[in-house]
A protein has these predicted regions:
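Acidic, surface-exposed loops and disordered segments
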Residues: 1-200
Length: 200
Protein backbone atom coordinates (compact mmCIF):
# COMPACT_ATOMS: atom_id res chain seq x y z
CA UNK A 1 0.00 0.00 0.00
CA UNK A 2 2.72 2.44 1.01
CA UNK A 3 4.79 1.48 -2.03
CA UNK A 4 1.90 2.14 -4.41
CA UNK A 5 1.13 5.48 -2.78
CA UNK A 6 4.75 6.60 -2.90
CA UNK A 7 5.03 5.48 -6.53
CA UNK A 8 1.89 7.44 -7.37
CA UNK A 9 3.21 10.51 -5.58
CA UNK A 10 6.55 10.09 -7.32
CA UNK A 11 4.89 9.88 -10.74
CA UNK A 12 2.84 12.97 -10.03
CA UNK A 13 5.89 14.77 -8.72
CA UNK A 14 7.81 14.06 -11.92
CA UNK A 15 4.95 15.50 -13.94
CA UNK A 16 4.75 18.58 -11.77
CA UNK A 17 8.44 18.97 -10.96
CA UNK A 18 8.98 21.59 -8.26
CA UNK A 19 5.29 22.52 -8.45
CA UNK A 20 3.37 23.67 -5.40
CA UNK A 21 2.51 20.87 -2.99
CA UNK A 22 -1.16 21.47 -3.64
CA UNK A 23 -0.79 20.08 -7.16
CA UNK A 24 0.25 16.74 -5.71
CA UNK A 25 -2.59 16.72 -3.22
CA UNK A 26 -5.15 17.18 -5.98
CA UNK A 27 -4.23 13.71 -7.23
CA UNK A 28 -4.11 11.97 -3.85
CA UNK A 29 -6.95 13.39 -1.77
CA UNK A 30 -10.40 14.79 -2.51
CA UNK A 31 -9.78 17.85 -0.35
CA UNK A 32 -6.72 19.08 1.56
CA UNK A 33 -7.13 19.10 5.32
CA UNK A 34 -7.35 22.36 7.22
CA UNK A 35 -3.91 21.68 8.66
CA UNK A 36 -2.35 21.20 5.23
CA UNK A 37 -3.86 24.49 4.12
CA UNK A 38 -2.40 26.15 7.22
CA UNK A 39 1.00 24.55 6.66
CA UNK A 40 0.97 25.66 3.04
CA UNK A 41 0.04 29.24 3.85
CA UNK A 42 2.48 29.75 6.73
CA UNK A 43 5.75 31.41 5.81
CA UNK A 44 8.72 33.05 7.52
CA UNK A 45 7.63 36.66 7.99
CA UNK A 46 10.41 39.25 7.99
CA UNK A 47 8.34 42.45 8.01
CA UNK A 48 5.64 43.42 10.50
CA UNK A 49 3.01 46.11 10.83
CA UNK A 50 3.41 48.67 13.59
CA UNK A 51 0.52 47.52 15.77
CA UNK A 52 0.12 45.46 18.90
CA UNK A 53 -1.03 41.88 19.02
CA UNK A 54 -4.16 41.51 21.20
CA UNK A 55 -3.66 39.81 24.56
CA UNK A 56 -6.12 37.03 23.72
CA UNK A 57 -4.01 36.08 20.69
CA UNK A 58 -0.86 35.98 22.80
CA UNK A 59 -2.67 33.73 25.28
CA UNK A 60 -3.83 31.46 22.46
CA UNK A 61 -0.29 31.09 21.14
CA UNK A 62 1.01 30.30 24.62
CA UNK A 63 -1.70 27.70 25.10
CA UNK A 64 -0.78 26.05 21.80
CA UNK A 65 2.85 26.01 22.92
CA UNK A 66 1.93 24.57 26.33
CA UNK A 67 0.07 21.71 24.66
CA UNK A 68 3.02 20.71 22.48
CA UNK A 69 4.23 17.12 22.92
CA UNK A 70 7.58 16.46 24.57
CA UNK A 71 9.55 13.26 25.07
CA UNK A 72 8.07 11.25 27.94
CA UNK A 73 5.95 14.36 28.63
CA UNK A 74 8.80 15.78 30.71
CA UNK A 75 8.17 19.31 29.38
CA UNK A 76 11.70 20.69 29.93
CA UNK A 77 10.74 23.88 28.10
CA UNK A 78 9.82 27.43 29.07
CA UNK A 79 8.48 30.32 27.00
CA UNK A 80 9.05 33.99 27.78
CA UNK A 81 7.13 36.81 26.11
CA UNK A 82 9.03 39.99 25.30
CA UNK A 83 6.79 42.90 24.37
CA UNK A 84 8.14 46.01 26.12
CA UNK A 85 10.54 48.57 24.73
CA UNK A 86 13.20 47.80 27.32
CA UNK A 87 13.04 44.04 26.78
CA UNK A 88 13.02 44.36 23.00
CA UNK A 89 16.03 46.66 23.20
CA UNK A 90 17.91 44.04 25.20
CA UNK A 91 17.02 41.32 22.69
CA UNK A 92 18.15 43.64 19.92
CA UNK A 93 21.64 43.57 21.39
CA UNK A 94 21.75 39.81 20.84
CA UNK A 95 20.35 39.68 17.30
CA UNK A 96 19.58 41.95 14.39
CA UNK A 97 16.72 39.72 13.27
CA UNK A 98 13.68 41.00 15.16
CA UNK A 99 12.31 42.66 12.01
CA UNK A 100 10.38 45.30 13.93
CA UNK A 101 7.96 42.76 15.43
CA UNK A 102 5.83 44.01 18.35
CA UNK A 103 6.61 40.96 20.45
CA UNK A 104 8.97 38.02 20.61
CA UNK A 105 8.47 34.57 22.10
CA UNK A 106 11.70 33.28 23.61
CA UNK A 107 11.88 29.49 23.89
CA UNK A 108 14.35 27.83 26.21
CA UNK A 109 14.98 24.36 27.57
CA UNK A 110 16.70 22.59 30.46
CA UNK A 111 18.66 19.56 29.24
CA UNK A 112 18.94 18.17 32.78
CA UNK A 113 15.14 17.92 32.93
CA UNK A 114 14.71 16.25 29.54
CA UNK A 115 14.38 12.67 28.41
CA UNK A 116 17.67 11.04 27.41
CA UNK A 117 17.94 8.12 24.99
CA UNK A 118 19.72 5.37 26.89
CA UNK A 119 21.47 3.84 23.89
CA UNK A 120 23.62 6.82 22.97
CA UNK A 121 22.85 9.54 25.52
CA UNK A 122 20.95 11.69 23.03
CA UNK A 123 19.23 14.49 24.98
CA UNK A 124 15.75 15.46 23.81
CA UNK A 125 15.58 18.99 25.25
CA UNK A 126 16.27 20.89 22.03
CA UNK A 127 13.89 18.68 20.06
CA UNK A 128 11.18 19.36 22.64
CA UNK A 129 11.84 23.09 22.36
CA UNK A 130 11.67 22.85 18.57
CA UNK A 131 8.25 21.21 18.77
CA UNK A 132 7.05 23.97 21.09
CA UNK A 133 8.41 26.55 18.67
CA UNK A 134 6.59 24.92 15.78
CA UNK A 135 3.32 25.11 17.71
CA UNK A 136 3.98 28.82 18.27
CA UNK A 137 4.45 29.43 14.55
CA UNK A 138 1.45 27.38 13.46
CA UNK A 139 -0.94 28.93 15.98
CA UNK A 140 0.28 32.39 15.02
CA UNK A 141 -0.42 31.58 11.37
CA UNK A 142 -3.87 30.25 12.24
CA UNK A 143 -4.62 33.59 13.93
CA UNK A 144 -3.57 35.52 10.84
CA UNK A 145 -0.25 36.57 12.34
CA UNK A 146 3.23 36.26 10.93
CA UNK A 147 6.24 34.71 12.62
CA UNK A 148 9.80 33.67 11.92
CA UNK A 149 12.18 31.26 13.59
CA UNK A 150 15.34 33.10 14.65
CA UNK A 151 18.30 30.97 15.62
CA UNK A 152 20.93 33.60 14.89
CA UNK A 153 21.54 35.29 18.24
CA UNK A 154 24.42 35.63 20.68
CA UNK A 155 23.75 33.39 23.71
CA UNK A 156 26.35 35.26 25.77
CA UNK A 157 24.51 38.54 25.25
CA UNK A 158 21.19 36.90 26.12
CA UNK A 159 22.73 35.59 29.35
CA UNK A 160 24.18 38.99 30.23
CA UNK A 161 21.01 40.96 29.50
CA UNK A 162 18.61 38.47 31.09
CA UNK A 163 20.11 36.99 34.29
CA UNK A 164 16.66 35.61 35.11
CA UNK A 165 17.21 33.04 32.34
CA UNK A 166 20.12 31.46 34.21
CA UNK A 167 19.92 27.69 34.02
CA UNK A 168 17.98 27.76 30.76
CA UNK A 169 19.36 27.18 27.28
CA UNK A 170 17.69 29.55 24.83
CA UNK A 171 16.94 27.61 21.64
CA UNK A 172 15.15 30.13 19.44
CA UNK A 173 13.43 33.50 19.25
CA UNK A 174 10.08 33.94 17.51
CA UNK A 175 9.21 37.49 16.43
CA UNK A 176 5.42 37.63 15.96
CA UNK A 177 3.04 40.26 14.63
CA UNK A 178 0.75 41.26 11.79
CA UNK A 179 2.57 40.50 8.54
CA UNK A 180 3.62 43.38 6.31
CA UNK A 181 5.67 41.45 3.77
CA UNK A 182 5.29 38.63 1.27
CA UNK A 183 7.02 35.25 1.49
CA UNK A 184 10.58 35.02 0.18
CA UNK A 185 10.85 33.62 -3.33
CA UNK A 186 12.52 30.47 -2.08
CA UNK A 187 9.56 29.72 0.20
CA UNK A 188 7.75 27.80 -2.55
CA UNK A 189 10.85 25.90 -3.64
CA UNK A 190 10.29 22.39 -2.33
CA UNK A 191 11.90 19.07 -3.09
CA UNK A 192 9.85 16.79 -5.30
CA UNK A 193 8.01 13.99 -3.50
CA UNK A 194 10.43 11.56 -5.11
CA UNK A 195 13.35 13.35 -3.45
CA UNK A 196 11.59 13.93 -0.16
CA UNK A 197 10.02 10.54 0.66
CA UNK A 198 10.78 6.91 -0.07
CA UNK A 199 9.84 3.44 1.08
CA UNK A 200 12.04 1.95 3.79
Amino acid sequence: MAKKLLQKLSDISRIHHRAAFTDVLKHTAPKPSAFLELARNRYSCRAFEDREVPANMVESILEAARLAPTAMDKQPVHVWVADTGDTMEKLGKATQYLYGAPLVFVVGCKPDEAWVRKYDGKNGAEVDAAIVGTHIMMEAADLGLGSVWVGSFDPAVIAAEFPELEGWEVVALFPVGYPAGAPAQRHSERKSMEEFASEL
